[in-house]
UniProtKB/Swiss-Prot annotation:
Family matches, as CDD domains: GH68 (cd08997)
Protein name, entry field: Inulosucrase
Gene: inuJ
Organism: Lactobacillus johnsonii (strain CNCM I-12250 / La1 / NCC 533)
Source organism superkingdom: Bacteria
Motif (LPXTG sorting signal): 761-765
GO BP annotations, alphabetical order: carbohydrate utilization
Keywords: Calcium, Carbohydrate metabolism, Cell wall, Glycosyltransferase, Metal-binding, Peptidoglycan-anchor, Secreted, Signal, Transferase
Family: Belongs to the glycosyl hydrolase 68 family.
UniProt-listed Enzyme Commission number(s): 2.4.1.9
PTM-bearing positions, type Pentaglycyl murein peptidoglycan amidated alanine: 764
Outcome of swapping residue 301 to S: 40% of wild-type activity
Amino acid sequence: MLENKNHKKISLSGKSLLMGTLSTAAIVLSASTANAATINADNVNENQTVEVTASSVNNENNKQVTEKDSADKSTSDVAEDANTKKSNENTETTEKNTQTVVTNAPVSDVKNTNTVTAETPVDKVVNNSDQKTTNAATTDTKKDDVKQVEKKDSVDKTNAEENKDSSVKPAENATKAELKGQVKDIVEESGVDTSKLTNDQINELNKINFSKEAKSGTQLTYNDFKKIAKTLIEQDARYAIPFFNASKIKNMPAAKTLDAQSGKVEDLEIWDSWPVQDAKTGYVSNWNGYQLVIGMMGVPNVNDNHIYLLYNKYGDNDFNHWKNAGPIFGLGTPVIQQWSGSATLNKDGSIQLYYTKVDTSDNNTNHQKLASATVYLNLEKDQDKISIAHVDNDHIVFEGDGYHYQTYDQWKETNKGADNIAMRDAHVIDDDNGNRYLVFEASTGTENYQGDDQIYQWLNYGGTNKDNLGDFFQILSNSDIKDRAKWSNAAIGIIKLNDDVKNPSVAKVYSPLISAPMVSDEIERPDVVKLGNKYYLFAATRLNRGSNDDAWMATNKAVGDNVAMIGYVSDNLTHGYVPLNESGVVLTASVPANWRTATYSYYAVPVEGRDDQLLITSYITNRGEVAGKGMHATWAPSFLLQINPDNTTTVLAKMTNQGDWIWDDSSENPDMMGVLEKDAPNSAALPGEWGKPVDWDLIGGYNLKPHQPVTPIPNVPTTPETPTTPDKPEVPTTPEVPTTPETPTPEAPKNPVKKTSQSKLPKAGDKNSFAAVVLGAVSSILGAVGLTGVSKRKRNN
């Protein structure tokens, strides 16, 4: 009995020892394998290759850009970074979700901007042009997505190898396409190995139209657009808008008045504005000792767009002295709105107004029409008061002819939500013979219409053949750029009016003065000024209305805004315009769009007695309180622009008070000048603005939500993007679902065979993992046997 009992003890001890050994081995091997999988996930994330979408072909360097290499990139690659972040989704995007690039750095941090976009050799552009941009994981890929990422990497690698093979060797059963005519020479001259072109690429190249005749006036080309963006990024002092002293900017006192829509006294904003001018010289008219200005005004954060008459003593530079005569078209007109235009005096002292009548009844699609009306005024001189007596002859002058200019019906037939409609901003000008014209913003008609075919118009590109080829493949390889290019057809149009001054109609319709097919869908607020024997045409534009995502995203990232004024010059009013400064750039943004000193809607006014200078007026673009609660859109300080005889321009360091429309000896006020220094007394930024991210949902629209409100406004979304130390932020700054495990693994687990959490399990198919599972299973069986034996012994004892 004793020997038998000892034998059982020895046998039991051996089983227990074997069980413990196997269990320990399984646990150690499982843990090390899981840890290896986790490390592997980190390595995949850190070394993930970032595919580059090229927009230029000037650089012959063939290196691939990886996430690791990006640390060595210069600021010239800034557009590439923006495009990689946003365009890689390769989906059709709207204005809301494409404007997502933010700036957290001062403008002065921009150092090297030799190019707007990352440049790639022609052969690399060609080989990648027909592929969708990658959706591969970047450094923020979650560890539990590693299997999917690796699977995709494997597929991408296989596809890349197949594409490489197919680009070199034609398919056995397919006929190799051939380049034809002029495009063949261009491709070969650009250094592309034609044997590596796919049939699809060759077919796309063969569609290119090399016609050299412009169909719709002078063209703003794709190359011009890139140059304008590059100039903005570089902050060239000849074109950068001067800095204003942010502490001196204030809301317009005269903007507190009866609102046209509500009929109540409201604190209104004011934006697009224009003086009553002599239609021939462009000088501000002197109406009975007063200067008159018409401006768009409305309640913040409301779709409220109407025009008001403002007045001040002629030559008075004091911003506080402006008064408001009220809305020109009266009260209670929410459906019919009035947008920008121009105005001149009639011989009887009445104002002939040209404006944009906007019908919003069709689902707020803003049906725009050029209109005219005669405005009669009352003057109570002893009370220093001007009022609107009555308005006559209010009628539609022009809303497109379908051929030169797109009509509303044409637009509505094809609009899918990505197409802008434009028939607005009529500017009046008389030629030397007394003929009257309107220059206006529009879209091209069937003469040179929007559509896919514009992508194949070589004339739209405007660079060297090599540059154009790279841009061509850039457009084809990016779905958002391609879609924008298809719809882009902005134009600056011109019509001649008949001799009925107070009730004008169209006498002749001309081809556009400027057009931007494939390049931009919005060039607005045209302004023509005659200086000496030349006509100078200016217009404002937002680059994010253009097709080249890489370019405008680069400006957003570098400066924080993408607005500009472009300019052209001609010996003739109705045709023959050439761009100023080679690309057309005249003014570029210099501060982020949500700073108190950001501006837009630039309007050039002649300086009396000078044929080489213009006074540039604009408004502070704080619509919807984007710069902070209570900071409204208001008139900006004006500044001088020098016009040089060689068709170049230079911004001068001459600045006025806010709302100065007449430059004279008393106009200059150096106190309004600012600097780009964070803590300077005359800084261009208010406290808290330096480094503040730009929320592009708030910029450039007509229904804007408040930005960082102190007190919530009823019925208006109040989600500040970067709250200033909130007690209870509406949007948590930490993720709702933490990236760390909710139940952390204990430092000293009591149960040595506790199941590993799912996020740390090894990958399926791993040999070590399989061995660990087998060992774990064996140990579990032996453990069960051992525990059973123990239980039996306890019961027997």
